[in-house]
């Protein structure tokens, strides 16, 4: 257990950040699955709508630092590529 005030504060901060990051990561996984499901059904409109939501969430996660910027770009690129194949 931590002995100093600053160490106790860091523990509290880490717990808060971990919870927030977990929630954001879970949301991203769900949105990725929605995009994949829309692509699977070959519904281009639904896929585009799901992609817009997913893209926005990924950008926000990267901006805050939950995921690295390159990973965000990779996620968006793969999703866009899958949607482009629907045509």
Curated annotation (Swiss-Prot):
Alphabetical list of SUPFAM superfamilies matching this protein: Ribosomal protein S20
Amino acid composition bias (Low complexity), ranges on this chain: 13-23
UniProt keyword annotation of Ribosomal protein present: yes
GO molecular function terms attached to this record: small ribosomal subunit rRNA binding; structural constituent of ribosome
Source superkingdom: Bacteria
Sequence segments annotated as region (Disordered): 1-26
Gene Ontology CC terms: small ribosomal subunit
GO BP annotations listed: translation
Keyword entries, A-Z: Ribonucleoprotein, Ribosomal protein, RNA-binding, rRNA-binding
InterPro entries: Ribosomal_bS20 (IPR002583), Ribosomal_bS20_sf (IPR036510)
Keyword Cell inner membrane: no
NCBIfam families referenced in this protein's UniProt entry, alphabetically: S20 (TIGR00029)
Family the UniProt entry places it in: Belongs to the bacterial ribosomal protein bS20 family.
Biological role stated in the UniProt entry: Binds directly to 16S ribosomal RNA.
Protein name: Small ribosomal subunit protein bS20
Native species: Akkermansia muciniphila (strain ATCC BAA-835 / DSM 22959 / JCM 33894 / BCRC 81048 / CCUG 64013 / CIP 107961 / Muc)
Taxonomic placement: Bacteria, Pseudomonadati, Verrucomicrobiota, Verrucomicrobiia, Verrucomicrobiales
Gene: rpsT
């Amino acid at each position: 257990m931590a002995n100093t005030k600053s160490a106790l504060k860091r523990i509290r901060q880490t717990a808060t950040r971990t919870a927030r990051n977990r929630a954001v990561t879970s949301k991203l996984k769900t949105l990725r699955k929605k995009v994949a499901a829309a692509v699977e059904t070959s519904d281009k409109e639904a896929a585009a709508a799901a992609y817009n939501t997913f893209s926005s969430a990924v950008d926000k996660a990267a901006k805050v630092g939950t995921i690295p910027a390159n990973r965000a770009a990779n996620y968006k690129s793969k999703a866009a590529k899958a949607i482009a194949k629907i045509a």
